[in-house]
Structures are given as structure tokens and as C-alpha cells.
């Protein structure tokens, strides 16, 4: 377990194989999308993974994984939980409200030290949830890039796909994305996650709120083409009435062009431009 504790308590490590933050956007099969469809949970190349997951909860991280990340692992004796959910609100562990006092033994960057015996954290030193779910990769995703998206996990988690380590993430309130193209396969796949209530990041995620844990926002997979928009920044100048877009395209060989379309609230085209990676309209 020392290797795991070293990971959780290392402030210089807050992500492993985790994709960089980006502006929210999703690939679509359509060139035109209605204004009311620009929502976080809508996308043509998306596979929702909310709903029933298998769960094993413990008050402290266990020394070995027990092979729970392996596709053949028998999870029939585990509980079932509907995600997204806060574990404490589902009956696993104790919800803790604290203002300025850390709910664990304060010794930065460590979170596994022994607190006073009358603290909840004395018995629940670092509550840990192990999650498993099976999903079938859509046939039309064959040959495309596949990303797993966790919209919110508190406070840290390790991820496996089909028994292979896919990455690690901290930052409870931001999404975590992992490129799992080389890990998924046609047909059934198994995703497994081990989530920890406390990590070195807990020292920054503090003050005046309920201390909860788990996969508390949506989980889904999505697919992009081999050439895809990785990020974009859009700025508007009200004085000149122009919009400028800076677009980061991955694996672009220059053979494709970009098109920028600005629509008014009714959906009508107000301006458009096409060309290279920097567009103005």
C-alpha cells in the first residue's frame, strides 16, 4: 500500500495519462445544431455510462487491488449503486461538515496520519470505493478515437480499462478525461475505478462545505475521428462586431479546412468564415 499512499500524498502528481483541460465541445454528425442542444450531456458520438455500477466500499484503502480491475473478476457479491452519487448519501461512510478544520490529521501533504480517536476519520481513515461496469463499444466506433469522461470524482481515483491501468486523477470539481483508444475492444469492455476520499489535493479543496466522496457527476465515453478538435478559444469584440476563434487540431496534416459559423439566438447564421487554424468572422 505504500506505493498507493505515496501517490495520494504527492502534491506534484495530480494526474497520470490524463488529457489536458479543454473548452467543452463534442463531436457531432450534423453540421447544424439547434441552440437548445448546446448542453453538457448531449452528443451524437456519446455512450452514457450512468446508471448501475458494482461497488465495494471500505473505510481505508486496501493493500492490494485483489484483481478487481480484471474483466474476469467475480463481482457478483458486490453491492450495486446508481451513478452519479455521493457515496455517503447512498449509505457508505459518514458525511462530514467542516468549516476550517480538516476532517483528517493535518500534516501537509499527508492525509493518512492518525487523528484523535473521537474523530470520524479515526475509523474512516480514507474511505475508498471500488467501482466496476461493463459496456459494449458501438460498432460504428471501430477505428475511431475513444475517450472516457468523468465529470466529477471526489477526491482522487485510479482507472483501469479491461484490466489495464488507464490513469489517475485529482481535482474533484473538474472533469477528467482519458484516451482509451488502445485499451478498448470490439464488443464488451470493463471499466474499473478506485476512488479515494482524501489526497494531497484535499488541502486545496477545503473550507465550509460537506466532505463527500465518490463519482458524483456523469460518466460517459465519447468518440472522435482520427483528426479532431482538441481545444478552442473564442473571443468576441463588440466594438468591431467580430468573433475570433483559435482552434487546436490534433493530427492535422493541412488537408482539411476549418469553418467558423456564428448563429444568432434564433439559429440563423450571423457570420461565417473558413480557412486555417485561426479564423475571424
Q: What feature does the model see in each segment?
A:
Residues 41-50, 70-73:
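N-terminal helix-cap/turn-to-beta initiation motif at the start of protein domains
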Residues 143-145, 239-246:
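Short coil/turn motif common to extracellular beta-sandwich-like domains
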Amino acid at each position: 500500500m505504500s506505493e498507493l499512499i505515496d501517490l495520494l500524498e504527492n502534491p506534484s502528481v495530480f494526474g497520470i495519462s490524463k488529457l489536458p483541460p479543454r473548452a467543452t465541445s463534442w463531436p457531432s454528425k450534423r453540421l447544424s445544431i439547434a441552440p437548445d442542444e448546446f448542453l453538457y450531456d448531449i452528443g451524437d458520438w456519446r455512450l452514457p455510462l450512468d446508471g448501475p455500477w458494482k461497488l465495494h466500499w471500505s473505510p481505508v484503502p486496501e493493500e492490494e487491488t485483489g484483481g478487481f480491475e480484471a474483466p474476469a473478476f467475480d463481482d457478483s457479491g458486490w453491492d450495486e449503486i446508481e451513478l452519479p452519487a455521493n457515496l455517503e448519501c447512498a449509505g457508505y461512510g459518514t458525511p462530514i461538515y467542516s468549516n476550517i478544520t480538516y476532517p483528517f490529521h493535518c500534516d501537509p501533504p499527508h492525509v493518512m496520519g492518525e487523528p484523535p480517536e473521537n474523530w470520524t476519520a479515526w475509523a474512516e481513515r480514507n474511505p475508498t470505493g471500488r467501482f466496476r461496469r461493463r459496456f459494449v463499444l458501438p460498432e460504428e466506433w471501430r477505428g475511431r478515437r475513444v475517450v472516457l469522461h468523468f465529470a466529477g470524482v471526489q477526491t482522487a481515483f485510479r482507472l483501469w480499462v479491461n484490466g489495464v491501468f488507464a490513469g489517475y486523477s485529482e481535482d474533484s470539481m473538474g472533469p477528467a478525461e482519458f484516451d482509451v483508444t488502445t485499451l478498448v475492444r470490439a464488443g464488451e469492455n470493463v471499466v474499473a475505478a478506485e476512488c479515494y476520499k482524501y489526497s494531497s489535493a484535499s488541502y486545496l479543496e477545503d473550507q465550509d462545505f460537506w466532505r463527500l466522496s465518490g463519482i458524483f457527476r456523469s460518466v460517459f465515453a465519447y468518440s472522435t475521428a482520427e483528426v479532431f478538435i482538441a481545444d478552442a478559444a473564442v473571443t468576441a469584440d463588440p466594438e468591431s462586431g467580430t468573433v475570433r476563434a483559435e482552434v487546436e487540431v490534433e493530427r492535422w496534416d493541412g488537408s482539411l479546412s476549418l469553418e467558423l459559423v456564428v448563429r444568432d439566438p434564433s439559429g440563423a447564421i450571423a457570420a461565417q468564415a473558413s480557412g486555417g487554424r485561426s479564423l475571424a468572422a
